[in-house]
Regions:
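Catalytic-pocket segment enriched in acidic/His residues
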Residues: 2-3, 56, 60, 116, ...
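His/acidic/aromatic-lined binding-pocket segments of jelly-roll/cupin-type domains
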Residues: 17, 124, 241
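Glycine-centered structural positions embedded in regular secondary structure
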Residues: 10, 15-17, 153, 175, ...
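Surface loops and adjacent helix of pleckstrin homology
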Residues: 21-22, 28-30, 113, 120, ...
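Glycine-enriched loop-and-adjacent helix/strand subsegments that border the catalytic/binding cleft
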Residues: 73-227, 233
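N-terminal non-catalytic cap/leader segment that marks the start of a structured domain
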Residues: 1-98, 263-267
Length: 298
């Protein structure tokens, strides 16, 4: 029996939607509120690949109406200094093991989110575009050669970080867990549709200007090694998210040459996990940008 094609999913006010590739969204006859809940049901993404379609709408009609695709995620793991380009620009030595942290799931937000910055606590909020992995099956004590088998999908993330809070507290979780600091989406792409798992591209733009452009081929700890390391200590469960690290080009990296580089100057930040060889798609939400706006692209 042929396996169903890996779906490309969004979440709307009318439930889960499947992108068709020709500008349409098939609204599915499924009871799940988001992709994490679908995965916790225990059948991977297959139900979304084969579900009956209630009706079809143009993707353009959902501009500004897409919801967080992983709102019910229970755990978000992150890793610091995991790109060679980031290590080079900061002058830091390569870590000998992944520098892991937890990001509160309550920090999550979705496409076209406007973030209320915690200005009474932090003046140094910074963007971090990342490729995010969505776990599909329970994972514990998993060897590297079996790690990818536990990944259901990938998506884009903006691991917003209050640099000054991290510095004064010594705690990455506190600096990364303010409400809205964990944007994911806008879409979730089934792993089977990823052409090259070892080189997933990432593009981050600020006010329309490219700031971060890299691929996971530059990771210090490639995905299988990263997942295997986490699973030595933790049971990763369906719907959990693992952020793979941010490349060079954050506001912090630019501070030496641009001392005024602060979030207050960022009208919008867009993170895109692009299909290999393709140009970034237009922003889903073409309205004038507002302070602190995050746009995650399909």
């Amino acid at each position: 029996m042929t396996a169903p094609e890996a779906p490309h999913l969004v979440v709307t006010g009318d439930g889960l939607g499947r992108l068709t590739g020709d500008g349409l969204v098939e609204l599915l006859d499924l009871p799940y509120r988001d992709v994490a809940e679908l995965l916790r049901a225990g059948h991977g993404l297959d139900p979304a690949a084969t579900a009956p379609v209630r009706h079809t709408v143009p993707l353009d009609s959902l501009t500004g109406a897409l919801r967080p695709p992983l709102a019910s995620t229970r755990a978000v793991w992150g890793v610091g200094l995991n790109y060679h380009c980031k290590a080079r620009i900061t002058g830091r030595p390569l870590p000998t093991a992944p520098l892991l942290f937890l990001k509160s799931a309550s920090a999550g937000s979705g496409p076209d989110a406007t973030v209320a910055l915690p200005e009474s606590i932090s003046r140094q909020a910074d963007y971090e575009g990342e490729v995010a992995l969505v776990i599909g099956t329970p994972m514990h004590h998993t060897p590297t050669d079996r790690a990818w088998a536990h990944v259901a999908a990938v998506t884009a993330a903006n691991d917003l970080t209050a640099r000054d809070v991290m510095a004064t507290s010594g705690n990455p979780t506190l600096g990364k867990s303010f409400p809205g600091f964990g944007a994911l989406g806008a879409s979730v792409l089934g792993l089977g549709a990823v052409a090259d798992r070892a080189a997933i591209p990432l593009l981050t733009t600020v006010n329309g200007e490219p700031r971060q452009q890299a691929s996971t081929a530059d990771l210090i700890f490639p995905v299988p090694d990263l997942l295997a390391w986490i699973s030595r200590y933790v049971l990763l469960e369906p719907g959990d998210v693992v952020l793979t690290g941010t490349p060079a080009g954050t506001g912090q990296d630019r501070a030496a040459s641009s001392p005024t580089e602060t979030w207050s100057r960022c009208r919008s930040v867009e993170c895109c996990r692009c299909a290999p060889g393709s140009a970034p798609s237009p922003p889903l939400v073409p309205r004038p940008a507002t302070p602190g706006r995050l746009v995650q692209r399909v």
